[in-house]
Amino acid sequence: MKERKVIIKTGLNLENSYTSLPEIFFTRQSPSCIPSPKLAVLNYPLITSLGLNAQVLQSADGVDILAGNKIPEEAIPIAQAYAGHQFGHFTMLGDGRALLLGEHITPLGDRFDIQLKGSGKTPYSRGGDGKAALGPMLREYIISEAMNALGIPTTRSLAVVTTGESIMREAELPGAILTRVAASHIRVGTFEYVSRWGTVEELRALANYTLQRHFKKGYDKENPYLFLLQEVIEKQAELIAKWQLVGFVHGVMNTDNMTISGETIDYGPCAFMDVYDPETVFSSIDIYGRYAYGNQPNIATWNLARFAETLLPLLHINPNEAIKIAENAVSDFTKLYKNNWLSGMRAKLGIFNEELEDEYLIEDLLSIMHKYGADYTNTFRALTFDNIEDTVLFDKMEFDKWYKLWQERLTRQEEAKLSSKQLMKSSNPSVIPRNHRVEEALEAAVKEGDYSVMEKLLDALSKPYDHSKEQDYYSKLPEPSTCPYQTYCGT
């Protein structure tokens, strides 16, 4: 690897504090060499926020770094080890096709993981080729950037490069590498891994590292590991509520895809719901609906219980006391989630203050939407219109009854009607990454090499709360189909 190390002024300021952990947590590994990398897409706003050099990154040397052909001098590429419950079944995992180059320290002192996804085989590849296809990498780029614009914590996509290789999946597909940026890649599955195969001291080392990386206030607490558990529960309660509020279906909420930082990660089989239905499932492998839209809060609770189990040796010297502490902490999730969800739903309806009856008002609207197969995003968007009478949402009599109750509710707050409208417009996106529009962009890019469709889509998705006429095209529903939209993990 030494001959591939280079000094190129990309602006990357890399450290790798993760390698200070015991070696059970990672394996040092070089990326595979790529025959003819070409830049497909580069995230200029993210480059600016990270303090990187766009001109160098889009040069031949920069593209070689994004492809893994050249390695920044200060980088220590590693594949991270972790485990996870996949559809409820525990298994050993790890980075099977990704390498962490290091942690970039921004000019403001913030720390972000820089990871190459699709960079070749690792000791954790489990028989896979370690490669990634262009379509799924572009899809992650689109969805993660849309999530960021919606204000939802997420990993980001810095770039996608094509590799010049063909890889075999369901067919022969063009290869690609995505550069992912994350607060960290520490997962519930990382803790599960060390809990199963490591020592208590190695578990403590990971917990202490996580506190130092994400929750420094925990050091001053009487029980820092309880603080760690509570903070992760709070972050996940906020995150899952935000997913539900925009109709996002993750599709593969395995414990290895739940981050400790509270960011959304892994955009393989995800999609946004069109017609409101709590049983919405997009993933082709989720045949029993374990990860359906309406079940996401329950699965989050289940995942957090698995996280709490890993911390038992650190929570209390007495195992029975440790279990009680963990159970009490996890039981808080439901209330925390519901408070976040209700607060977000009130905002979507222009409600500033709290009343006990609000939940009934919200549930009544959702029930009507479900009954009439209404589009989730466009229904809330229509409620922001001044002339809502011109928009036929459901059965007129049923909707009029609900609408009257809603208008009466708005009178029981001090804020003016204009303020309510502004709150609604800032809480209800006019555009989301509609599945048919995403597929349209991917088909043009992958099959025709035309990235203009994707660029226009990304531009619209970058301003989801603008409510402009230009976004009307992206808010239109797909044509009715007898075949439901399905997603695939892309691996």
Swiss-Prot record:
ATP binds at G94, G96, R97, K117, D129, G130, R180, R187, D266. GO terms for molecular function: AMPylase activity; ATP binding; magnesium ion binding. Its cofactor is Mg(2+); Mn(2+). The keyword Manganese applies. It holds the Pfam family SelO. The active site is at D256 (proton acceptor). Mg(2+) binds at N257, D266. Keywords: ATP-binding, Magnesium, Manganese, Metal-binding, Nucleotide-binding, Nucleotidyltransferase, Transferase. Its EC number is 2.7.7.-, 2.7.7.108. InterPro entries: SelO. It comes from the Bacteria. It catalyses: L-seryl-[protein] + ATP = 3-O-(5'-adenylyl)-L-seryl-[protein] + diphosphate; L-threonyl-[protein] + ATP = 3-O-(5'-adenylyl)-L-threonyl-[protein] + diphosphate; L-tyrosyl-[protein] + ATP = O-(5'-adenylyl)-L-tyrosyl-[protein] + diphosphate; L-histidyl-[protein] + UTP = N(tele)-(5'-uridylyl)-L-histidyl-[protein] + diphosphate. Nucleotidyltransferase involved in the post-translational modification of proteins. It can catalyze the addition of adenosine monophosphate (AMP) or uridine monophosphate (UMP) to a protein, resulting in modifications known as AMPylation and UMPylation. Belongs to the SELO family. This is Protein nucleotidyltransferase YdiU.
